[in-house]
Design a protein with these regions (language model features):
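Hydrophobic transmembrane alpha-helices and their immediate loop junctions
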Residues: 1-136
Length: 136
C-alpha cells in the first residue's frame, strides 16, 4: 500500500477515535480554524497574500506568501496573533459562561486556553518555535 494511502487511513482512524471520545471535536476544529484565520488577517494587513489552508487530524496551517519579507516585529505579530486570539476568546467565553452557565462556553474556555498554550510551545511547526526564532 502506498504511503499516501496509509497516511489517509491513519488520519481517518485517528479522527474516528477522537470523535468517539469527545463530542467537542467540532468545537475544537472551529476554534482551530479561527486561530489560523487570525494569522491570515494580521498577515494580510501587512500586505501578505494568503496562499492555502490545510487542516488534518494532526493540526492546521495557514500558508502565507511573502511572510519572510516582513520585519521581525511584524512577523512576531503574525505568529502571536493565533495564541492571542485564543486567549481573548477564552476570556470572552469565561464571561459568557459565568453569565449563562452553558457547557459549550465552558468547553470553549478549556479548548481555547489549551490551544493558546499548546501553540506557544517552542516546538516546530508550532507558533512558539517561530516566536523563539525571532526573539533569539
Amino acid at each position: 500500500m502506498k504511503k499516501k494511502y496509509r497516511v489517509i487511513i491513519l488520519q481517518i482512524l485517528i479522527l474516528i477515535f477522537i470523535i468517539s471520545i469527545n463530542g467537542n471535536f467540532l468545537i475544537g476544529v472551529f476554534w482551530i480554524t479561527l486561530h489560523e484565520l487570525s494569522h491570515i488577517v494580521i498577515a494580510s494587513s501587512y500586505g501578505c497574500k494568503f496562499n492555502n489552508f490545510k487542516i488534518n487530524v494532526l493540526g492546521a496551517k495557514a500558508e502565507i506568501c511573502e511572510i519572510e519579507e516582513l520585519s521581525e516585529k511584524r512577523k512576531l505579530n503574525v505568529y502571536l496573533a493565533g495564541p492571542c486570539f485564543n486567549f481573548i476568546i477564552a476570556m470572552m467565553m469565561y464571561i459568557l459562561n459565568y453569565k449563562y452557565n452553558l457547557v459549550i462556553f465552558e468547553n470553549s474556555v478549556k479548548i481555547n486556553l489549551s490551544l493558546g498554550l499548546f501553540n506557544l510551545l517552542p516546538a516546530y511547526p508550532l507558533d512558539g518555535s517561530r516566536i523563539c526564532e525571532i526573539l533569539r
